[in-house]
């Protein structure tokens, strides 16, 4: 972690008394657009996360993907649905929704309930979902930076 994040002071916290399943953390660096050129730009995090979410949804992995801002939520949802259309599995589009500020409280409760009930496989959210909502049994929780 020191090498990845450039931090000198890193402390491992490995004891937690709360009951939970195993967790694994993965830091994902988007691939180069042109691997033959060392200084090449990288694939956009939105595009890369879209492919990851489609991969997870196809395998029925319950996922909440966090984005910093509303615009990222909207862009990512649009890309995921386009990718599902391209792969001719558009019916899975109904299994993923966004959750962000700007929605009415009633709409947010409907989305939460759909996730609790198992009607949704994925939510693309801002930190609006982090505040006071406990959705258990998630398989994955990527964060777009």
PLM regions: where:
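Conserved helicase ATPase core of P-loop NTP-dependent helicases/translocases
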Residues: 97-126
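Short, surface-exposed connector motifs at secondary-structure boundaries
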Residues: 56-63, 92-95, 134-140
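Conserved interdomain linker/interface between the two RecA-like ATPase lobes of SF2 helicase motors
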Residues: 2-73
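A short beta-strand element within the Helicase C-terminal
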Residues: 124, 129-145
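Conserved acidic residues
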Residues: 10, 121, 139
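Alpha-helical scaffold elements adjacent to nucleotide-binding pockets in ATP/GTP-utilizing enzyme cores
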Residues: 1-4, 75-83, 110-114, 137-140
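Short hydrophobic/charged patches on amphipathic alpha-helices used for structural packing
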Residues: 50-54, 112, 130
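Conserved helicase motor "Helicase C" RecA-like lobe of SF1/SF2 P-loop NTPases
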Residues: 70-93
């Amino acid at each position: 972690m020191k090498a990845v994040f450039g931090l000198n002071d890193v402390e491992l916290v490995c004891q937690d008394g709360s009951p939970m399943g195993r967790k694994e953390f993965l830091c994902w660096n988007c691939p180069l657009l042109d691997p033959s050129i060392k200084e090449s730009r990288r694939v956009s995090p939105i595009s890369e996360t879209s492919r990851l979410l489609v991969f997870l949804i196809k395998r029925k992995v319950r996922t909440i993907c966090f984005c910093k801002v509303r615009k990222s939520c909207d862009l990512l949802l649009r890309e995921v649905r386009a990718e599902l259309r391209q792969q001719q599995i558009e019916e899975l589009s109904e299994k993923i929704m966004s959750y962000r500020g700007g929605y009415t409280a009633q709409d947010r409760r409907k989305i939460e309930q759909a996730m609790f009930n198992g009607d949704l496989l994925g939510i693309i959210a801002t930190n609006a979902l982090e505040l006071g909502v406990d959705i258990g049994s998630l398989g994955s929780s990527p964060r777009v930076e």
